[in-house]
């Protein structure tokens, strides 16, 4: 067999798998990770959101002058963690799946930011509990990494319509895209 035909056969063997990888893997990767950064309304700063659909995690970096914070929304475990830079503490809470936007909602909203089509805003209030979390590893790597080196506390979602019996100045106001506002209220013990 001439050398030319061997090269052609080898080339065919390489092309077929390359086409399969391109057809199946590339679209899957596109669906797995989505990121975007955009200016915040009414504030100086930006919010960067990264969606990892495969792991079920949304990471948020908000460098607003009014309320700088980082966050993780772990959809597989229904957990929300927020690192509040003004309080130098982390807060961990159970996410109510009915109240939070889905991963698909967030991914679609990231694509619509430039056009200004936003879903309605919802607000939730959480109260910080005095118990400090000792073992962050049990809540997964994204939350452990986010809250490393700062005290971390549990927070409980307030039922809608219940009045807060605490100082409103103790609340940190967070915004997630235009989906929802979160208020995390209460004194952080030891600070």
UniProtKB/Swiss-Prot annotation:
InterPro entries: BRICHOS_dom, Gastrokine. GO terms for cellular component: extracellular space. SMART domains: BRICHOS. The keyword Secreted applies. Keywords: Disulfide bond, Glycoprotein, Secreted, Signal. Residues 63-155 form the BRICHOS domain. Glycans are attached at residue 33. Its main location: secreted. It comes from the Eukaryota. One of its GO terms (biological process) is negative regulation of epithelial cell proliferation. The keyword Signal applies. Residues 1-30 form the signal peptide. Transmembrane segments: none annotated. It holds the Pfam family BRICHOS. Expressed in stomach. Present in mucus cells at the base of antral glands, and Brunner glands of the duodenum. Present at lower levels in the mucus neck cell region of the fundus (at protein level). Disulfide bonds join 90-147. It is found in: Secreted. Gene3D superfamilies: 3.30.390.150. Changing residue 171 to G: Impaired secretion. Belongs to the gastrokine family. Inhibits gastric epithelial cell proliferation. This is Gastrokine-3.
